[in-house]
């Protein structure tokens, strides 16, 4: 029995995953993931999305199962809160505001900023220590802490590079992707029709702007990570009755060997006939409903 969450055409279609960008904004490197176009908007081939999502979810599951660390990254407004919510749900790490250059490649500097944040936290929580500061100084420290939290809250317990990067919007997060590539950190990413999938180990063709789509992705990612965590804890002899209490970021502290790159599905021949039929029927039904509404 599969340990990863199941995903189907209908769930993706209902979440609007099939809607790409206007045809004028496309990236030709995404051609093999595009089914066609409707009203000057590219339609993403959800048959491939289903297959590739399963590959990506398995990569997430295997990483956490082997005590690896996952870093979720998306700083776009509509994804910011969702990324944090689901990363915390599965006890992993996240960057959901500004990506600071060198977050992966210059970890020493980032670690220094995290140390500053922890010191500010300690000082501001110590009422006795605060008596030695003026109101202006305390206000300055509070603002400094808040500024650091925006960028570092999701990685303050990350003590080394992650074992897998999960990205929504490869265009916006190109710096994070470039740093991961330099450090040979595998990448899972949602790739829209205007994206460049070249450096992505586990691409998932899909809408990277819709809140419903983003929430669906993150829910699946978190569920896969939790399944991996459960297997890891079983192997360690942890009481599964206490599973819900184990969301401490320190749980995933061991390094794991790098996962082999999954074979990428880029041709419809890799998609089974049942999935082909399901996708085409779903699109036809959507068209019929649209025509009925406009009648």
UniProtKB/Swiss-Prot annotation:
NCBIfam families: rpsB_bact (TIGR01011). Keywords: Ribonucleoprotein, Ribosomal protein. Residues 278-295 have a biased composition (Basic and acidic residues). It comes from Rickettsia peacockii (strain Rustic). The keyword Signal does not apply. Residues 263-295 are annotated as: Disordered. InterPro entries: Ribosomal_uS2, Ribosomal_uS2_bac/mit/plastid, Ribosomal_uS2_CS, Ribosomal_uS2_flav_dom_sf. Gene3D superfamilies: Glucose-6-phosphate isomerase like protein, domain 1, Helix hairpin bin. GO terms for molecular function: structural constituent of ribosome. One of its GO terms (biological process) is translation. This is Small ribosomal subunit protein uS2. Coiled coil: none annotated. Belongs to the universal ribosomal protein uS2 family. GO terms for cellular component: cytosolic small ribosomal subunit.
